[in-house]
Amino acid sequence: MSAHCQVTGRKPSFGKSVSHSHRRTSRRWNPNVQRRKFYVPSEGRTITLTVSTKGLKVIDRDGIEAVVAQIRARGEKI
């Protein structure tokens, strides 16, 4: 499962870990993504999305129908 939100487009960010002796090593911060199933009434079926926790709040605010329309407008297949 890739760490990529289908709703917000959030991806991992990159940076450095700094130890006590100030040695820097590369690391990445993954977004908190989860696979969730949502029922889409207009299609009469459930869809599975990989969403971040912020994406879940967007779905609660805008509704699953509007979010699915935005994802399809970007060209992603669901």
UniProtKB/Swiss-Prot annotation:
It comes from Corynebacterium glutamicum (strain ATCC 13032 / DSM 20300 / JCM 1318 / BCRC 11384 / CCUG 27702 / LMG 3730 / NBRC 12168 / NCIMB 10025 / NRRL B-2784 / 534). One of its GO terms (molecular function) is structural constituent of ribosome. InterPro entries: Ribosomal_bL28, Ribosomal_bL28/bL31-like_sf, Ribosomal_bL28_bact-type, Ribosomal_bL28_sf. GO terms for biological process: translation. HAMAP family: Ribosomal_bL28. Belongs to the bacterial ribosomal protein bL28 family. Keywords: Ribonucleoprotein, Ribosomal protein. This is Large ribosomal subunit protein bL28. It holds the Pfam family Ribosomal_L28. Transmembrane segments: none annotated.
